[in-house]
């Protein structure tokens, strides 16, 4: 079994690293942490333009249709550089939940928008079949444990 990245994956990794170094993402992360922003908008737009938000989205939904190893090399470089973007919520959480569990209608509606960065995704979960509301919560936090 070969655990090495392919030459294409190494090229992607090198390009991602060089790009993120040129963007001074560590400096941008500090600015986001010390400011009111949720992420660095200009860096996020660049990530979208590079096609990284479309990495694992199937081509039929306007994605690149690449695999998890390609996603891994991009994610590793984003993490290494502390890139302050909503990549994790949009790509790992929302995109993967839709690919794995979404109806065809949900996939057609949301995956192309996630691929192009038109929307930022995240994952939400509710406890019951009732509408999400603080009054409907039965889960409590006691001694740092959910009960």
Tell me what each language-model feature is.
Residues 63-64, 105-147:
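Glycine-rich, Trp-frequent "lid" loop and neighboring beta-strands that shape
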Residues 19-23, 97, 121-122:
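Short alpha-helical functional segments enriched in proximate histidine and acidic residues
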Residues 1-88, 109, 113:
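Amphipathic, small/basic residue-rich leader segments at the start of a protein or domain
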């Amino acid at each position: 079994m070969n655990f090495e990245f392919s030459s294409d994956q190494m090229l992607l990794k090198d390009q991602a690293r060089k790009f993120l170094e040129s963007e001074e993402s560590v400096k941008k992360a500090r600015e986001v942490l010390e400011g009111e922003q949720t992420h660095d908008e200009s860096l996020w737009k660049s990530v979208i333009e590079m096609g990284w938000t479309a990495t694992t989205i199937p081509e039929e939904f306007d994605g690149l249709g690449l695999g998890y190893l390609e996603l891994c090399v991009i994610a590793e470089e984003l993490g290494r550089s502390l890139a302050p973007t909503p990549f994790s919520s949009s790509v790992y959480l929302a995109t993967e939940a839709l690919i794995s569990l979404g109806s065809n209608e949900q996939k057609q509606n949301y995956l192309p928008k996630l691929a192009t960065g038109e929307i930022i995704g995240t994952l939400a979960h509710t406890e019951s079949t009732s509408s999400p509301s603080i009054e409907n919560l039965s889960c409590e936090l006691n001694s740092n444990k959910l009960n």
